[in-house]
Amino acid sequence: MQITSNEISVEVNGQSYTLPAGSTLGDALEVSRASYIAGTAVGIIKRAAEKRTEEITEYAIKTPRGELRIELKDPESSSGKLWAEHYKEYEGTYIHWASPEALAFGPFEADIKPFHETGSFEAFDVVFGAGGFDPHNTHLIISRKRHVAEYGAPEDGVFATVVTGRNLIFRLSREDPILSIEPIIEWEQLAEKTCTTDLSTILEDEDSVFTYFEVELSRNSPKGAEHFYALTRKGTLSVDVTTSSFISDDTLREEPVPYENFELRKEGAISVRTVGYGTGRTYISREERPSSLVHSIVGQVITGIELIKLAEKGQKLSVESLPPQIVLLGHSFEEVEPVLTAIGIELVKEGYTEENAVIVKQDPPTTLEILGEAKVTAYGVPREKLIEVELYPERAPKSVDFFRHSLELKTKPVGKLPVHMIYDNTYLFKTEKEAVKYKEVLPENTPADTVLAGEIGITNQAAKRMGTIGVRLVDDDLFGPTGEKFSSTNIIGRILEPERLIGIEEGDAIYVSEVVRRKTDEQEN
């Protein structure tokens, strides 16, 4: 389609659209119906700017065993120019020969003048070499170690160096071809690029827009994948840290994740730190990094890596995950059964299974394990046994974090809370996860005069029973919900229907879900 002067051509997530000149980012999103969540950042690249980028000096060479990158020493040298003009012609070539000193892809014809001279080569040097000093029998030679050889190289000799993926040089064999060669655009050189939430931004011809990124989660990391599902349960990822090599989301920092998958952190790799400072933090690689014994790979960005590279600290990005999460907790059997049947998953019902049942436990617990087994067992209880709570993170942030962490409400919609003791109108609970070992409960939001019925309290570190959780069914102006004095009690929220506690006994467990009230509701009240 011919574009007139009154029109512009814009790409949105890889699809082309023709828009009137002067159209905004919001117009493009409306026309394209792109996947987008209000308030998230959108990346924009000016293609005209990309064409004006400085000389490209780095190239990615993909093989069946992984990717390596080479950097040109001098793009203006004869071999540098030859490479830049003809690198696509080397795709599909196989390793013709390999030795302990070097390996060679080819042969192919090249416009070089081979010299009958012995050359000295360092490990990871890249050079053109003509077998039998015949330019029709040219090879791309990569040095494995320091050595001396006569390859029929042109006068300028070594023209590039392997800068990443060096371990691949020692694993490649004769059946391995070059799958593709792509230039690496240095994004820092692109002045005309942006990542914005402003939908009134005016677009120009040949702009490319990226509204979301898509992730494929690794079946080798079922628990790590569940961590990522929990992190992005609202369809967004927070950009808390940005560097040249990664972005990270700290929302689930300090939430433990097991190490499951040792892989190269390729561009777009999603990893979770499993030990040490920053445990639970999720990273997305902007460039290739070595494998790490403290970073478990949980997935890979398969669409929208541009948005990852453009993102700025403090922004939220829209994300979609494959496969979609399977979460039964908080739902009825009637809600989940047809969905599971449609994707070939057998549902086994246990516990209370009547019409008013709500699912509070599932086995296997993770999406990828359920898909692998094509079967899930769900445990139900009467809906009145599910206790809904409203928490006060603004008033007691540390204590609410302790509560959510202890009940695993950060990663699951329903948490379990064992009943420790009941007396008078007081109910005391002890969490299954002993979070007091590594989380402090400092005094915050301590009551001043009266604690209302149904308010949830946690004993802070001013008393011996730190971490005890309590609720009372009556107002009290002397002691907090855990039976401690006010100065030893942090109020973290309230139970919406405290009468649901009536009838439970010591040794039982209640199931808890968090309800987030809308600000409009609060304003009306």
UniProtKB/Swiss-Prot annotation:
InterPro entries: Methan_mark_3. It comes from the Archaea. HAMAP family: UPF0288 (MF_01089). Belongs to the UPF0288 family. This is UPF0288 protein MA_3997.
